[in-house]
């Protein structure tokens, strides 16, 4: 079971940067993505892991399908995947494009998922 603390709080900035560098060297066609449950989410389960290596040709709709399957959601359950806790991106957008635009300074691409698209901002 993953920790309740966000990934950024569990690992130092230097460790995260080093890990991304190793991942990109060993898997140049994979995007390092951290996917965590939105902190206020109550309905959706917690993923069994938070770190994913996503092939760079995958688009957002494929990633959503993968995450829905991992969460074992039924087709009627609402599910929203947000980049950097704020951006809903087009499902046809390749993950490589999103990575270039939205990656964190540590090199990971951060996403959160929730059952509602309104987050009280």
Curated annotation (Swiss-Prot):
| Residue positions where Phosphoserine is found in the record | 12
Residues of the region (Important for interaction with ATG13 and for autophagosome formation) are: 49-53
InterPro entries, A to Z: Atg8-like (IPR004241), Ubiquitin-like_domsf (IPR029071)
In terms of Pfam families, this protein maps to: ATG8
Tell me the superkingdom of the source: Eukaryota
Q: What is its main location?
A: membrane
**Phosphatidylserine amidated glycine lipidation sites on this chain?**
120
Q: Which residues form the propeptide?
A: 121
Q: In the record, which residues receive a covalent lipid, type Phosphatidylethanolamine amidated glycine? A: 120
**GO BP term, pick one:** autophagosome assembly
List locations, semicolon-separated.
Endomembrane system; Cytoplasmic vesicle, Autophagosome membrane; Cytoplasmic vesicle, Autophagosome; Cytoplasm, Cytoskeleton
Q: How is it modified after translation?
A: The precursor molecule is cleaved by ATG4 (ATG4A, ATG4B, ATG4C or ATG4D) to expose the glycine at the C-terminus and form the cytosolic form, LC3-I. The processed form is then activated by APG7L/ATG7, transferred to ATG3 and conjugated to phosphatidylethanolamine (PE) phospholipid to form the membrane-bound form, LC3-II. During non-canonical autophagy, the processed form is conjugated to phosphatidylserine (PS) phospholipid. ATG4 proteins also mediate the delipidation of PE-conjugated forms. Phosphorylation at Ser-12 by PKA inhibits conjugation to phosphatidylethanolamine (PE).
Record's keyword annotation contains Glycoprotein: no
For site (Cleavage), what residue positions does UniProt give? 120-121
Q: Which GO terms describe its cellular component?
A: autolysosome; autophagosome; autophagosome membrane; cytoplasmic vesicle; cytosol; endomembrane system; microtubule; organelle membrane
Tell me a Gene Ontology molecular-function term this record carries: phospholipid binding
Tell me the keywords, alphabetical order: Autophagy, Cytoplasm, Cytoplasmic vesicle, Cytoskeleton, Lipoprotein, Membrane, Microtubule, Phosphoprotein, Ubl conjugation pathway
Membrane topology term reads: Lipid-anchor
- Work out whether the entry's keyword set contains Membrane: yes
Assembly behavior: 3 different light chains, LC1 (a cleavage product of MAP1B), LC2 (a cleavage product of MAP1A) and LC3 (produced by one of the MAP1LC3 genes), can associate with the MAP1A or MAP1B heavy chains. Interacts with TP53INP1 and TP53INP2. Directly interacts with SQSTM1; this interaction leads to MAP1LC3A recruitment to inclusion bodies containing polyubiquitinated protein aggregates and to inclusion body degradation by autophagy. Interacts with ATG13. Interacts with ULK1. Interacts with TBC1D5. Found in a complex with UBQLN1 and UBQLN2. Interacts with UBQLN4 (via STI1 1 and 2 domains).
Give the family per the record.
Answer: Belongs to the ATG8 family.
Its function, per the record, reads: Ubiquitin-like modifier involved in formation of autophagosomal vacuoles (autophagosomes). While LC3s are involved in elongation of the phagophore membrane, the GABARAP/GATE-16 subfamily is essential for a later stage in autophagosome maturation. Through its interaction with the reticulophagy receptor TEX264, participates in the remodeling of subdomains of the endoplasmic reticulum into autophagosomes upon nutrient stress, which then fuse with lysosomes for endoplasmic reticulum turnover.
UniProt cross-references to PANTHER family, sorted A to Z: MICROTUBULE-ASSOCIATED PROTEINS 1A/1B LIGHT CHAIN 3-RELATED (PTHR10969)
Mind telling me what this protein is named? Microtubule-associated protein 1 light chain 3 alpha
- Naturally occurring in which organism (per UniProt): Bos taurus (Bovine)
């Amino acid at each position: 079971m993953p920790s309740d603390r966000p990934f950024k709080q569990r690992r130092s900035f230097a460790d995260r940067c080093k890990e991304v560098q190793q991942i990109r060297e060993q898997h140049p066609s994979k995007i390092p993505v951290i996917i965590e449950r939105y902190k206020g989410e109550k309905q959706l389960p917690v993923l069994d892991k938070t770190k994913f290596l996503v092939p760079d040709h995958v688009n957002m709709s494929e990633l959503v399908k993968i995450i829905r399957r991992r969460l074992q959601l039924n087709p009627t359950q609402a599910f929203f995947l947000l980049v950097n806790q704020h951006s809903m991106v087009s499902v046809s957008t390749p993950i490589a494009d999103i990575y270039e635009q939205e990656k964190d300074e540590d090199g990971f691409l951060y996403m959160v998922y929730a059952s509602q698209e309104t987050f009280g901002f």
